[in-house]
UniProtKB/Swiss-Prot annotation:
Coiled coil: none
Function: Catalyzes the synthesis of Und-PP-GlcNAc-ManNAcA-Fuc4NAc (Lipid III), the third lipid-linked intermediate involved in ECA synthesis.
EC number(s) recorded for this UniProt protein: 2.4.1.325
Listed name of the protein: TDP-N-acetylfucosamine:lipid II N-acetylfucosaminyltransferase
Amino acid sequence: MITLTHVLGSDIPHHNLTVLRFFNDVLAKCLPVEQVRHFMVAAKETAPFSSFPQLDINTYSDKKALAEAVIARAQADRSARFFWHGQFNATLWLALLSGKIKPGQVYWHVWGADLYEDAKSLKFRLFYLLRRIAQGRGGHVFATRGDLIHYQQRHPRVPASLLYFPTRMDPALTAINIDKPLAGPMTILVGNSGDTTNRHIEALKAIHQQFGPDVRVIIPMGYPANNEAYIEQVRQAGLALFSQDNLRILTEQIPFDDYLNILRECDLGYFIFNRQQGIGTLCLLTQFGVPFVLSRKNPFWQDLAEQHIPVFFYGDTLDEPMIREAQRQLAGLDKQAIAFFNPNYIEGWKQALALAAGEHP
């Protein structure tokens, strides 16, 4: 049996730990060790990895060191296969482009930003051109429905399959309907992180225009790190529109259960990023019966429509009665059948890893 090496090529602690936890706690119990055990991870902080005894994790201090190790392994053994979980490591894309890593060695699960081309500088535009060519050379691509449609417009001949990120979810909560108070101001969650792609200030202005100054706004900005200047910009813009009591900015990463409690309080999510991101938060809001606003440029709306989940589009007319109706629809939805919920996404992972390991064509 072919041994897969899983590559987490950038130091993104929150997402990387989610993947490692899923492999250690779930997949290691039901799949061959050759498909799930071996990881190469870029990480400065390695202490959390001690929680994953079922995995063999090789760590590297930065993206460059990891890329050099992957390239060396790929060149030493051309039968080696790598499963890329998201890929934000430029050196690896260039290695695939130049032939240092062969197409048949790479199986790539799209996370979102690794597919889209948001930055505008000349340096990034040149890199995007090279990366786009490289992305047409992998052995197989896995992604959401919307991302697959986007990808296949450029690379229609590359084999591709549906696969969802293993969002951390408690399936026991899926069957519980949470009653929303119909009186009092609404609570709106803005964005899924402190990343500028959330367009927080634009979202705050739109919320103020649509719902006035009395709604409560919660903005999670616990990551990325070293983001104080942008957080302060968002804070000042928010305080110009909402009172201090109605504006809550979360500047620290918070425990998962505390985050769930915050999401339960919300009446609406507001996510206007122009690409696929934040699926984890969207899943959790849906689980709790909270509708959300998305940009039409976010292709994940196609996955939502496929699962009959109501969604509002940024720029469309929106008022509180429409939100309450969407909450009612979500309450009546069979959430246990949603394809990208836990445990439904597990079967897709079994199929993806078997395919990458050559177990079926």
